[in-house]
Design a protein with these regions (language model features):
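Residue-level preference for hydrophobic side chains embedded in well-ordered alpha helices
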Residues: 4, 8, 12, 33, ...
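Sigma70-family region 2
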Residues: 31-47, 67
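Arg/Lys-rich amphipathic alpha helix in sigma70-family domain 2
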Residues: 54-74
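A short, charge-rich alpha-helical start-of-domain segment used by transcription regulators
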Residues: 1-12, 24-27, 43
């Protein structure tokens, strides 16, 4: 399971870095994607690359939303 995720780590980091512009934030998103991957039943994933791409993209979009609207983060 870890080896499979690790084969996509560079790809996921590149997506997150392009979206966020920060290596530290990109690494955080990769780690969060891994946690989501860990807690998802593997038999429900039909395409690992598509699943991981969707997760990291949505996480980055959420991060960008909070960067633009920090007052919403305070309410969470």
């Amino acid at each position: 399971m870890v080896e499979t995720f690790e084969s996509y780590r560079t790809y996921l980091f590149a997506i997150a870095y392009r979206m966020l512009g920060s290596a530290m934030d990109a690494e955080d998103m990769v780690q969060e994607t891994y946690l989501r991957y860990q807690t998802t039943p593997k038999d429900s994933i039909t395409s690992l690359k598509a699943f991981l791409t969707t997760i990291i993209t949505r996480l980055c979009m959420d991060q960008l939303h909070f960067m633009v609207n920090p007052e919403k983060l305070a309410r969470v």
